[in-house]
């Protein structure tokens, strides 16, 4: 009976760890997609001239981006490295866990950049500067910590 209880406990603990890993991966993938779709996409298109400038819409996108970025830091716990063959277009590089302080600093820098950009998108030129700054932050992290799995 004792061995059975230990075996069941070990199985449940293992299943819980796998579920937690999967949950973190799914949450961060969903948030990253939402950051583009609901956050920076409209301001980015406006800055490129692909959409008419709308200050309220630009600010709403930046606010959404800030909301999403605030949720990101805890979504890379030690047990949430991506599987060997992820079924998503992009995944997190294992370099994140090799250099967690740098990764966390990049997230903090993005948070700061978003906060500093608020209210600066008063016209297209201001929005272009905001998008340029945010893009540099995003690229700085994605170049090092994002893996493209399939095209």
What does each model-found stretch correspond to?
Residues 21-151:
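Sequence context surrounding c-type heme c attachment/ligation sites in exported
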């Amino acid at each position: 009976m004792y061995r059975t209880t230990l075996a069941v406990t070990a199985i449940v603990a293992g299943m819980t760890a796998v579920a937690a890993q999967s949950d973190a991966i799914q949450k961060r993938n969903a948030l990253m997609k939402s950051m583009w779709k609901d956050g920076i996409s409209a301001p980015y298109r406006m800055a490129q001239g692909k959409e008419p400038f709308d200050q309220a819409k630009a600010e709403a996108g930046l606010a959404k981006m800030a909301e999403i970025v605030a949720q990101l830091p805890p979504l890379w716990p030690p047990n949430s490295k991506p599987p060997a063959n992820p079924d998503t277009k992009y995944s997190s590089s294992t370099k994140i866990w090799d250099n967690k302080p740098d990764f966390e600093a990049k997230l903090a820098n993005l948070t700061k950049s978003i906060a500093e950009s608020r209210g600066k998108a008063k016209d297209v030129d201001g929005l272009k500067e905001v998008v340029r700054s945010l893009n540099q932050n995003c690229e700085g992290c994605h170049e090092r910590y994002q893996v493209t799995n399939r095209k």
